[in-house]
């Protein structure tokens, strides 16, 4: 009471640590535990500081009741709903089996599963929590083969482990554990490209990055003289042109080419975006007085931005690519992109019209298009660099994207300020009101859509009922 008020004490959330549902101590004295009510670190292998030595990257049940660890370090865990999960000594999920059934007495099914144990022959013993009968499971040839491969790898017998994992793959070609095992064996054998193939199938980006680092080093050492020679040749060519091209024929030809590009109105309007990042205030002033830019050029830039955004989402290197285009709803993305853009433009135009802004609807439409070039360049750079960087160099991509996004936001802010002839305070206020208006319009639109769907279902049901009555 000396520190907190009564209201603070009432609202204070009790910091109660999660409790273990069970403990196990193996032959080496290492303590293992299971925790209920969490999907992270539900199975723990404790070090002397109490931390978890396992790296469980797979989804774990939040109702683990018991566990057992055999002499090889393999972890067997029971789930209250009747499932049995088996993990490797390092925490990789090997397999899961079992199910829940309250009204059936079927082998392998449980009403609840409170405990588990394993004998010296590798047989799993369980007890049904409600019905009270024991069930035992004998390891299959496939399971024994997996256990054997893991044991060989832990003993450092990588060639023998590779042979064993290869046999496992013959039985199950999509086994993530087997592909990881083959990849690790290849990694220790120095067969990095083959290791990358298996890590890619297994979705193991950490080890893929490790193998890729070795492949990249080998490529750099082999190609560095060639790359250096090409760069030196280009520098020498540039030097010779500057020295012997006294009449500047090459430079004039380049200028003529650029001039021809700028004589094409649409191309000129698109390339106008390149001037914005360097001098945003001056160039947005030119846009304001209708000297530069066009709705057509802005539309092309929006299209290019959308294409780059989709490539950024789906086209990065394996290490940094977490989405597949098959898992994306393209129609929803296209509609969402168009809706957000349209709402921002309309809301900002309406707000600035009330707040005495000078910008027209077309100019408000053009401002974001000409301001997002740094973000577009950043996305293009990240896409390319994602194929040559490893996990440890991810911070470079983060910095590049952050620079591009911040630069683009500054451009758009200055564009709104310049085109509407606002002060900084007025621009901030107009943006706040724009986003509030944006949210209100979005909520109203969603309500209308939901009500229309309900009305349509109601009318459809009436039509169906009327048709049924007429026919009968």
Regions from the language model: what does each represent?
Residues 212-231:
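Juxtamembrane/start-of-transmembrane alpha-helix segments at the extracytoplasmic/lumenal side
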Residues 174-178, 203-218:
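Boundary/linker segments of alpha-helical solenoid repeat arrays
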Residues 1-179:
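Eukaryotic scaffold repeat domains enriched in small/polar residues
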Residues 187-209, 235-236:
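TPR/TPR-like (Sel1-like) alpha-helical repeat modules
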Residues 331-335, 344-450, 454:
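Hydrophobic alpha-helical transmembrane segments and adjacent short intramembrane/lumenal linkers
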Residues 154-155, 188-189, 222:
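Register position in tetratricopeptide repeats
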Residues 258-362:
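Selected alpha-helical membrane-embedding segments in polytopic membrane proteins
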């Amino acid at each position: 009471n000396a520190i907190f008020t009564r209201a603070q004490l009432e609202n204070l959330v009790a910091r109660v640590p999660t409790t273990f549902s069970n403990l196990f101590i193996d032959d080496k004295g290492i303590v293992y535990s299971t925790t209920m009510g969490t999907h992270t670190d539900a199975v723990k292998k404790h070090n002397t500081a109490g931390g978890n030595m396992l790296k469980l990257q797979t989804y774990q049940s939040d109702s683990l009741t018991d566990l057992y660890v055999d002499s090889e370090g393999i972890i067997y865990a029971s789930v209250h709903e009747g499932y049995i999960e088996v993990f490797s000594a390092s925490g990789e999920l090997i397999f899961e089996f079992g199910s829940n059934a309250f009204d059936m007495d079927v082998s392998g099914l449980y009403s609840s599963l409170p405990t588990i144990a394993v004998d010296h022959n590798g047989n799993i013993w369980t007890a049904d929590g409600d019905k009270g009968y024991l069930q035992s499971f004998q390891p299959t040839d496939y399971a024994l083969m997996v256990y054997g491969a893991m044991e060989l790898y832990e003993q450092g017998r990588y060639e023998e482990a590779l042979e064993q994992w290869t046999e496992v793959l013959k039985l199950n070609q999509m086994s993530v554990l087997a592909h990881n095992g083959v990849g690790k064996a290849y990694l220790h054998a120095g067969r990095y490209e083959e290791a990358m193939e298996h890590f890619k199938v297994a979705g193991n980006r950490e080890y893929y990055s490790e193998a890729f680092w070795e492949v990249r080093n080998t490529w750099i050492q082999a190609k560095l003289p060639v790359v250096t020679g090409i760069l030196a040749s280009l520098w020498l060519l540039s030097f010779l042109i500057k020295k012997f091209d006294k009449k500047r024929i090459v430079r004039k030809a380049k200028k003529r080419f650029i001039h021809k590009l700028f004589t094409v109105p649409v191309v000129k309007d698109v390339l106008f975006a390149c001037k914005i990042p360097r001098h945003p205030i001056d160039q947005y002033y030119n846009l304001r007085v209708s000297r530069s830019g066009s709705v057509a050029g802005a539309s092309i830039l929006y299209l290019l931005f959308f294409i780059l955004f989709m490539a950024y989402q789906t086209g990065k290197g394996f290490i940094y690519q977490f989405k597949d285009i098959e898992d994306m709803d393209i129609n929803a993305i296209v509609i969402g992109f168009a809706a957000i853009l349209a709402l921002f433009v309309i809301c900002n135009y309406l707000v600035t019209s009330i707040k005495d802004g000078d910008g027209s609807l077309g100019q408000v439409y053009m401002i974001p298009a000409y301001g997002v070039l740094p973000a577009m360049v950043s996305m293009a750079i990240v896409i390319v660099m994602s194929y040559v960087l490893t996990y440890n160099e991810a911070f470079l991509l983060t910095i590049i994207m952050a620079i591009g996004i911040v630069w683009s936001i500054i451009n758009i802010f200055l564009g709104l300020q310049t085109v509407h002839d606002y002060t900084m305070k007025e621009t901030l206020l107009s943006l706040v009101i724009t986003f509030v208006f944006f949210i209100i319009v979005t909520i109203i639109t969603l309500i209308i859509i939901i009500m229309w769907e309900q009305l349509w279902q109601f009318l459809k049901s009436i039509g169906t009922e009327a048709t049924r009555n007429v026919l009968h």
